[in-house]
Amino acid sequence: IGVIFIGGDSGYIGGYKEFGEKFNVKYAVLPTGGYETRWFAAYEHMNIEDSLNAAADLKCRVMIPVHWGAFHLGVEPPDYTGFRFNSIVKNNENMADIIKLINLGEVFYL
């Protein structure tokens, strides 16, 4: 059936790999937004590269980035994370099945 992993407010940690080895993670909801400047935000939010690494470590089938687009928390514009993930999906067809970017107010059925 699979596990839904919710990262909450967390930066990238090595424990994701261990979790991915022990559990069948189907969905990973990862905090990806409000991540600049790194010296301040790295402990609580992942940047895009960190979240992609966490998704790989967790061996999830679907990654859902959260904490982006609603509030201006970091130096990056609020919609920048969505723009970057859309670019990644556009340039890497295999990522379209893995990254599910959910817009504010949008419904995503598991």
For the regions a protein language model found, what residue spans apply to each?
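Beta-strand-turn-beta hairpins that frame and shape the catalytic cleft
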Residues: 1-4, 110
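Cap/insert and terminal regions of metallo-dependent hydrolase folds
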Residues: 3, 10-103
